[in-house]
Amino acid sequence: LHEQVGRVEHDKFSDFNKKTVDLIVSEARNLAVKEILPTQKAGDEQGCVFENGQVKVPESFHRAWELYREGEWLAMTDTPEYGGQGMPMTVGTAALEYMVGANPSFMLYSGMTHGAARLVESFGTDEQKHMYLENMFSGRWGGTMLLTEPEAGSDVGALTTTATPRGDGTYHIKGTKIFISGGENDLVENIVHPVLARIDGAPGGTAGISLFLVPKYRVNEDGTPGEFNHVECTGIEEKMGIHGNATATLALGEKGDCIGTLLGKENKGMREMFQMMNEARAFVGLQGLAVASASYMYALDYARNRIQGRHLLAGKDKEAQSVRIIEHPDVRRQLLTMKSMVEGMRSLIYYNAGCIDEAGTTDDPEEKKRFEALVEVLTPIVKGYVTDRSLEVCSHAVQVYGGYGYISEYPVEQLMRDSRIFMIYEGTNGIQAADLLGRKLSMHDGQAFAWYLSAMRNTVEEARGQTELADLSEKVGDAVTRLESLAEDLKERVKAGGVMNAFSFAHPFLEITGDVSVAWMLLWRAHVALPKLLKKTGTLEMPDVMEKAGKNKEAAFYAGQWKTAAFFINKMLP
């Protein structure tokens, strides 16, 4: 963990030493396991209840939310000026993974609130910051993101919600928004909605969209929630999964004055909202990782305890005893597939968080540009690839359980249902693939993707110096070269006018880029692990390593990194 978490050395993070980081992550795990995890199944079964325009979340959510608030977890990585704790993004990501894995629908209320608050922090006036930020970062008030309309889903430029000036600097907002996560709930005293709308007379398409802050309740002079602002919840969706999160339809200004204030500049709403969208995409990638990790751990535990069938080597010996299913080759294959994906994706997401930390602390403009570009390249991979693989991991978990995995009594059934939405919301994975191919390959005249490939090659060169990793390094290096050639080929197709042809390969390109990225991260993990393994065992000869790993937990962990990298690179890397 400490090889990636909290590594940025800067005065801003001077309080976050190893001991402090361990304490933070340990406390996050305790809250997740003891308080949030028990709400997962109850929240799924009870769901949200819509009645007379109000939504009641599952009863168990209230205690968990209060404890989450008391621990000041919502604003872990934010400025202390508005109630944040100022942690490195890597530390916050590690802590958040536990809680999201415990109950993704519960933590979605937090994720949306945080993203909305960050919009206010980035683009709000001093008055707006004073009015909203502390209440939102504390979790006393909630937040959402109002983009989607019945006829404007991925095509946001087709929205019809209007903003009419009222003559006092505020606007009358009118329109309908759908699929709003946490759009109405009884966890918080007020809900602050960032709303995309078009000011009367503004240009059509995305060029004429502005961003507004629209609270559920207007804010009194003393900062308390006041008069209802006519943000009417007209219903919530019945969904396949994430039942504990209210997916609302909201009618703004249909039955009375719905008043909003401009956030940022007129007609710049899409540019501003992209900040929240990119944060949300990273959060959804973390949801994918966390749920995949939970599925893997459940499947591993089940396979270690479920006794069924004789060992393959027992042949036709009718006297042979049945063994735990983890002894069966195909179960082991599935578990190794899950393990390699989860660990590779985890390191990729933590690497992305580290780039955010570096970009936010470096004084070198060129380094800042490079790290920000790496985050841009990583965003569609983290959102698109990770959530695709998350569903795959969940499917493997169900398969390991066999028939029991298909029954709601067991947790993997719910996790698979919950994970399906991750591939859809905050920009479908088809959009993520198009973004990677259409925007990120050409960003900074191709330099952004070149920096990404260079980071991979740096790891390959470092790992190549270890004899035990020479072969794996060669294979990853070859994959990086082939990925570079593929990217150049697709760019040339676009330049030659073959746009439709090139973009038909967008999703396979995302998948290949993700697989190479996971191989890169697993190679890095093995590179870090081998010296530690040698220190624990005194040898890197595999038979001796495995014997000693059976007696030493840490040695087993480090040996596992080596074996996992070898499995993925040899068996799964394209």
Language-model features: locations:
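Amphipathic, small/basic residue-rich leader segments at the start of a protein or domain
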Residues: 1-107, 127, 131, 357, ...
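Internal maturation/activation junctions in enzymes
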Residues: 48, 109-113, 124-166, 176, ...
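Conserved phosphate/anionic-ligand binding catalytic regions in large, soluble enzymes, centered on
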Residues: 77-88, 105-107, 285-292, 388-407, ...
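A structural-propensity feature for long, helix-poor, extended segments
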Residues: 114, 125-128, 132, 428, ...
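A short core secondary-structure module
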Residues: 170, 174-228
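A glycine-rich, basic-preceded beta-loop-alpha segment at the flavin cofactor/substrate interface
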Residues: 179, 218-234, 239, 246-280, ...
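Alpha-helix capping/hinge segments and adjacent helical runs
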Residues: 242, 351, 373-451, 567-574
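C-terminal amphipathic alpha-helical interaction region
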Residues: 443, 459-574
